[in-house]
């Protein structure tokens, strides 16, 4: 019996093979690979092992096969569905906002989202959701920030769903 992931890519049409290696890295700029792997129930590094190229430019021996793609697409879709229901309520209490953002985005933390949608630096979202004695001196979430964050999360969900759609096309 062959372990999932060990088969050659010949089980999948060429267009889907090309799509996996072209589109998945783009998606991983927005979504942590660990979040997808956790949803799939596979070990950490499972995705990167299959995306890495060898020195001669070819992909490593362990590649995606049809069974891998089914699990991968299912996991991405489930994460996208979770993101579609994220709606961050505004509260003057910064700790409440921070806690809600952490809980809502703990599975899919996206620093690029903060950069693109909120105009913050890469670490700003983490900075605003951190806790500690100096919390009161840190930047506060504004109602506008949280509205942009909610919109950004939903746009990310659409991106994830369209990834699966792309791979399903013949």
Where are the predicted features?
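Secondary-structure boundary/capping signal
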Residues: 32, 44, 80, 121-122, ...
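Short, charged recognition helix plus adjacent turn
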Residues: 10, 55, 81-103, 107, ...
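Short alpha-helical "recognition helix" segments of helix-turn-helix
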Residues: 32-40, 108-118
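A short, Lys/Arg-rich alpha-helix, primarily the initiator
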Residues: 2-33, 77, 85-109
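Recognition helix of helix-turn-helix/homeodomain-like DNA-binding domains
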Residues: 43-64, 121-141
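DNA major-groove recognition helix of helix-turn-helix/homeodomain DNA-binding modules
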Residues: 62-83, 139-161
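Short, charged/polar micro-motifs that form catalytic or ligand-binding hotspots
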Residues: 26, 37, 62, 103, ...
């Amino acid at each position: 019996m062959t372990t999932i992931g060990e088969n050659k890519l010949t089980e999948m049409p060429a267009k889907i093979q090309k799509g996996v290696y072209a589109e998945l890295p783009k998606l991983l700029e927005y979504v942590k690979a660990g979040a997808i792997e956790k949803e799939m129930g596979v070990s950490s590094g499972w995705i990167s092992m299959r995306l890495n190229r060898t020195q001669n430019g070819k992909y490593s021996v362990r590649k995606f096969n049809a069974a891998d793609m089914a699990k991968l697409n299912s996991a991405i879709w489930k994460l996208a569905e979770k993101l579609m229901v994220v709606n961050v309520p505004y509260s003057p209490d910064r700790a409440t906002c921070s806690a809600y953002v952490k809980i809502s985005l703990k599975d899919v933390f996206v620093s690029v989202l903060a950069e693109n949608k909120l105009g913050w630096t890469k670490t700003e979202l983490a900075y605003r959701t951190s806790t500690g004695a100096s919390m009161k001196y840190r930047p506060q979430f504004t109602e506008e920030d949280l509205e942009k964050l909610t919109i950004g999360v939903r746009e990310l969900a659409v991106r994830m769903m369209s990834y699966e759609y792309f791979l399903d096309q013949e």
